[in-house]
Structure formats: C-alpha cells, structure tokens
Amino acid sequence: MAKKGKRYAGALQKVDRTKFYDASEALTLVSDIAGAKFDETVEAHIKLGVDSRHADQQVRGAVVLPHGTGKTKRVLVFAKGEKAKEAEQAGADFVGAEELVQKIQGENWFDFDIVVATPDMMGVVGRLGRVLGPKGLMPNPKSGTVTFDVAKAIDEIKAGKVEYRLDKTNIIHVPVGKVSFGGEKLTENFTALMDAIIKAKPAAAKGQYLRSITVASSMGPGVKINPARTAE
C-alpha cells in the first residue's frame, strides 16, 4: 500500500492540477507517468451537459478505436441456423440459443465480455434482462449488438469496438487503450471516441455539451483535458 502511495504521489507531482491540457499532451503525460508493474488501461471520463433522466437526452453508441483497446474481447452470440454458423466462422467465442440462457441462469456463468444477438433471438435474450442489464451486457441496436449481420459485429468488436453510454451522473467512462500504446496512439483512439460522442449530441441538449474531460491510467492520477479545444 505504501509503495502504491509513493508511486501515485510521484506521478501526481508531475501533473499540473490547475491546468487544462491538450489531448495529445495529456495522454502522453498519462502514458509517461504510469508506474505500475502491469500494462495499465487508460480511461477517459467525459462529463456531458445533458440530463440522463430524460429519454431525449440519452447519449449511447459505439465506435471502433483505430488501435483497439489492448484487450481481446470474448464475444457471445445468440443466433440459430445459418447465422450461428456465420458467427462461428467470424470468430465468436460462444454461439448458441436457449442452452446459453440456461447456462447463464443456472450456473451464474459470465465468461464473456460482450453479447451479440440476432433480432429474432431477442425474445429469448430478454429473459436474461435482469442479469445482463446491470452488467451492461444486454444487446442493444444503438451499439450495433442487435443485428443480423453478426459477422460484421464480431469483426468490429474484435478490432477494438467500444461502447459508450451515460451513467446516472451524466458521465461516460471508456477505455482508450493501454499505457504501452504511447501518446500518439492513445490520442488517435481518444479523438475517434470524442468524434463519435460529439456526433451523438442529442437535439434536446442545451448549453455547453462537453463539461469536463479527464484521462487517467488504472493506478495513476487524473489529467484534465480542455473540453473547448476538444470540441473544435
């Protein structure tokens, strides 16, 4: 615990907490000051000027990061017949129908990171709403995980597709890579994410859309990014 405290304090000294950095400067700094013995994940935390309590101010979607996230996601696909074969050929880790519902319900099995379903299977998948929903695993058309084009969905996920959505405090939390990516690749991933979030701005949103942006590694301090420069 003391080691972590010293490491964190040392990293914190290198961050100007009164400054709003440009994205490339901030992400290079996050990468440079990371000191853990593992390859830390870098996350972006974006506070938006919307009210998630209103249906017309929801912000949700997905974007393929140009350099991926540094993690290979395990994909479970609910499909039957030809679509099940397509999913297997595309590299899905698990493919099935009712038997997977029973496995999840009966064994509390969650050895997967994302769920894709063909539209005709949503009646079956809906039975898992109470267990998949709280874990953020429920397939959704807005994120491209309810589709008949299962091969495309799997390809995008394996290539580094990430989902983004508001939490109850109107903040989006999304990984943009690993510290080993370095500043340039992290910045390119971050830019792709921000472009998608800006395009997803609800028509009902009033005032400043990007309220605050912070990036940080798993064990490191937050570095603030200038939201005005990001929106340009």
Curated annotation (Swiss-Prot):
Q: Which PROSITE patterns does this chain map to?
A: RIBOSOMAL_L1
Note whether Membrane occurs among the keywords: no
One biological process term in Gene Ontology: regulation of translation
Task: Name any one Pfam family assigned in the record.
Answer: Ribosomal_L1
Q: Which SUPFAM superfamilies match?
A: Ribosomal protein L1
Please describe the quaternary structure of this protein.
Part of the 50S ribosomal subunit.
Query: Which HAMAP family does UniProt cross-reference here?
Result: Ribosomal_uL1_B (MF_01318_B)
Q: What role does it play?
A: Binds directly to 23S rRNA. The L1 stalk is quite mobile in the ribosome, and is involved in E site tRNA release.
- Listed name of the protein: Large ribosomal subunit protein uL1
